[in-house]
């Protein structure tokens, strides 16, 4: 095809990419998380992209808490958090696991970092 390539206009730019299909990834956060800020971020994320986020679950290190908090949701529905009484085996950091369809995991990483201001955040398989 010899036709010139043009970039899509910003008005037509979407963060949905059907070529991505169903994928999963984890956010690993090596800093304590402010509970209110996290709740606001997750609410906004699921409000905007809940139809593309099939599942989110995780264990969080919350500022001021001695033990982790477990969270989970399905699309637009978030269940009540569970305050755990012990730490599971392994490293004591926050981890959120997402199952997505047609949504770039990099978008979730960028939004989390921008919204929370936390820098010790990475993705994992």
Features from the language model and the residues they span:
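C-terminal accessory "lid"/substrate-recognition subdomains
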Residues: 1-91, 101-125
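Flexible loop/N-cap segments at domain edges
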Residues: 98
